[in-house]
């Protein structure tokens, strides 16, 4: 039995609802598809105002860097079309865990790999944390 299965059958808790699973997948789709389509409204729906998006990587000179992006920067970047050049890519979504109003999702495209944490708010599921890296063969050093 995996940790996820144990969490799903813990006393007083049941498996995640199909509605929650669908809503989490829709949130992640809004995040990526909003980015690729230049749709700031979809991005705004997907990210929590307190979003902490980070990437730990190396710049062109191999200097370690920490890149941080806010919810406003993601929304404005999407609306400005910053992700359109990478549109049409595949999107793989794997929900790793759901419980107690939080979820963990592994998502990837041809260009990005993200570890996402979501919270269930009165407005629905939203991404509160995102740790990302470039997919193999992409990014500034590709």
Predicted regions and their residues:
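Short, low-complexity N-terminal intrinsically disordered segments enriched in polar/charged residues
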Residues: 1-41, 45-50, 61, 66-68, ...
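Short beta-strand edge/turn micro-motifs at domain boundaries
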Residues: 2-3, 104-106, 113-139
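Residue-identity detector for glycine
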Residues: 14, 34, 38-40, 77, ...
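Surface-exposed, charged secondary-structure patches
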Residues: 20-23, 52-112
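Compositionally biased, intrinsically disordered low-complexity regions enriched in proline and serine
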Residues: 32-33, 57, 113, 126
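Solvent-exposed, well-ordered amphipathic alpha-helical segments
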Residues: 35-36, 46, 73-75, 88-91, ...
